[in-house]
Every structure is written in C-alpha cells, then in structure tokens.
C-alpha cells in the first residue's frame, strides 16, 4: 500500500510539472507576455502601438534556460522612443551576426530577419538584443536567459 502511495505521489508530481509547462506555453505566446517580459528584464517598455508579428519562445528546462525572439511592427517611426531608450546607430557587426545566427537556429521567416543591406539601430541590455530596422518599421528583440 505504501508503494502505491509513493508511486501515486511521483505520478502527480510529474503530471503537475508537465501541466505547468503546457499552461506556460499558452501564456508565453501572447503579445502582452512578450512585451512584459522584455520590460521586466530591460526596463524598456515596448510601445503599445507596436504589433507583434512573429514570436518564438522556448524554455529548455524548468531552471529558466530560455530564449525568445519577437518581432514588432510599427505604423510610423518611433523616433522619440528610440532616442529615449538610447538606441545606437553605430554599426555592431557582432550583434548583427549573433541575431542572424539565432534567427537561423529558431527558423525565423526571412521577412523578420535583418537583411545585410538594412540600416538599423540597436540596443543591448541584460542579455536582450534589440534591433530596429527603419525601412521595415520593425523591432527585433532576442532574449536569452541562462
């Protein structure tokens, strides 16, 4: 009888562990979650009019090893927001190569990647890379937590 109780407890623990993962997967796909997570980590608030057009999230374990690749589109240039958050227009080839690698790794469609001809502005804070592409009016955000 004791063995049955122990097995039942172990099964319940495993069920709860996977149920948490499944419920978390639904929440992590929302624009509100993506924006909130970026703000929590960096202090940078993504403008409310930015529309999330692509999102990838993967948590590799319950120990918080995860990555997020989100793309937001704007209707017009968020000039004030870019200046307020100190985005740089100096070229950062290392950041660009890193984002290209990550985009390839997670299977990001071509239209949501940085093109080698694109001008861009960038910001890097607390393990979060942000690249704004003016000619596409889009912001690419890559979060990696280890």
Please name every model-derived segment.
Residues 86-146:
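Extracytoplasmic electrostatic interaction patches
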Residues 18-84:
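N-terminal export/targeting and maturation segments
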Residues 4-12:
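Sec-dependent signal peptide recognition
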Residues 13-17:
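Alpha-helical transmembrane segments
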Residues 8-9, 43, 108:
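Short amphipathic alpha-helical "recognition" segments used for binding
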């Amino acid at each position: 009888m004791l063995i049955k109780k122990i097995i039942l407890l172990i099964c319940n623990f495993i069920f709860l562990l996977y149920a948490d993962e499944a419920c978390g997967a639904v929440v992590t796909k929302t624009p509100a979650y993506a924006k909130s997570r970026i703000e929590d980590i960096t202090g940078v608030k993504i403008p409310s009019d930015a529309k999330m057009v692509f999102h990838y999230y993967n948590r590799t374990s319950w120990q918080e090893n995860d990555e997020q690749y989100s793309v937001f589109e704007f209707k017009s240039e968020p000039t004030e927001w870019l200046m307020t958050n100190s985005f740089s227009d100096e070229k950062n080839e290392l950041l660009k190569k890193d984002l290209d690698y990550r985009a390839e790794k997670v299977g990001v469609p071509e239209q949501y990647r940085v093109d080698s001809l694109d001008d861009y502005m960038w910001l890097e804070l607390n393990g979060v890379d942000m690249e704004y592409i003016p000619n596409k009016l889009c912001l690419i955000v890559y979060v990696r937590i280890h």
